[in-house]
Amino acid sequence: MKKSFLIILCLALLSCVTGCKDSTQTLLKKSVEMEGISTDSMLFYLQQIQSPNHLSDKQRAEYCFQLYKATLWKTQKPKDSLLKVCIPLFLHVGDTAQWLQAQLEQANSFFYKDQPDSILHSARELRDKTKYMTPTQQRYYYNIQKFTYFNQKKYPEALKLANKVLALNNPSNDTLSLFYDHRTQLEILRKMGKTD
């Protein structure tokens, strides 16, 4: 009888532990599903996760990155402390795609805070990783640098990057992006005095 009770107790505890892990993963997944739909829903699901510091490295990285994005979209202000947690964790667990995206978000945060040296340093660190980026990530990567050089009045560097962005855009049918990219290129040329 005592042995049966211990076995049942162990099974109950085991199911609770695995149930918590499953529910954490489900909440993270639901938060991801709410991206671009509802920031409040993202935050709601993330707030349901109990003890985020006790998650696995992968789950903690996902949690911090989701919380970073939700906070950014809600407040329009980046929260670097969350990126400082998730970037090394993504690298540690081998999630290159998320690591790259978090690094790009870090560069964007530097842009928001008007830290051009930090932006260009981040860009140099990612230079050999562009082959792993999606075309959208590459556009993001080059645009951040382009606007940094533009703000520093380094127009030849900005123009090179504007041309790279346009080359990435041409195969797509995204006419709004093409419009903005051409407009930026023309603005750079105007600043250089080459608008003929």
Where are these regions (language model features)?
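A "functional boundary" signal
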Residues: 4-5, 10, 16-196
